[in-house]
Amino acid sequence: MGMFSELLFQLLFLFQSAIGGSMITTDKVFADPRVAQLANAAQAGDLTRIETLIKAGTPVKFVGQEGMTVTHYALRARRNAPQVIELLLKAGADPVSMLSDGNNVPHYAVSRDNADPEVVKVLMTHGIGPNWFPPKGVYNDLSMLQAAVMGHNLPVIKLLVERGADLNYVDPFSGSALHYALNGTDFYMAAYLVEAGINLKLLDSTSPEIKNPRTVRRTAIEKFCYFDGGKRGDDPLPEAADGWRVFTAALAKRGVTMPCGL
């Protein structure tokens, strides 16, 4: 249960510490004070100030500490987030903005708390498709759909699927989007993936790098039942119980009975 949570924490930590709190201010991130001002304006959602700074020649592609760019700050805009992103990307800002540890803007955009589908739509108009992958780094096997599932962002999940995300992509270690969706208590995501037609027979641990002969490859349902099935007791959280009913009903429509309980 903890593996995906830890991965998501790692994915978000540098963003949160650099742009979500008071520990690191923009003048410490960007050596160019103009860029620091632009980052502040982006985070504030001040469209007029952003336009003024861009027209004044502020370098929107400037890379700061750990690979930070103004695009990262735009994702944290307190208002007007889609418009902020659009202004910056139209001016030439980097929609990918890889950090030094491999984290990136597209994954953060779909996995952050309360991710905004409208922001994701803007990224899509600037080259970030529903099946985009990082060009390198430790997260280059993580799909956009899987990242959205990790963030528990059902509206974004639906958007990605509607735009053509590969439901049946398999991470060579962690498995399918359904593996991710069943790693927690939000079964509404799993229900949606089942209703959308995800292949229920996809396995995890398929990477040739896994040399342990004892490794057991499991479907998402098999893995859930092995590690978590029946362990939530007779009185689960109401939202978990309701999501479970929706999930098992979605399976039933496909002629599948869940082999274990909640």
Residue spans of the language-model regions?
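Conserved ankyrin/ankyrin-like repeat signature
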Residues: 49, 83-84, 118-119, 155-156, ...
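Ankyrin repeat domain, specifically the short helix-to-loop turn at the C-terminus of the second helix
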Residues: 51-59, 86-94, 121-130, 158-166, ...
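Ankyrin-repeat-protein effector appendages
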Residues: 23-37, 196-201, 205-206, 214-262
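Classical Sec-dependent N-terminal signal peptides that target proteins to the secretory pathway
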Residues: 2-20
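Ankyrin repeat A-helix N-terminal signature
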Residues: 40-45, 73-81, 108-116, 147-153, ...
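Ankyrin repeat boundary signal
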Residues: 60-63, 95-98, 130-136, 167-170, ...
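Start-of-repeat signature of ankyrin repeats
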Residues: 34, 67, 102, 137-141, ...
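N-terminal segments that cap or nucleate solenoid repeat domains
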Residues: 23-67
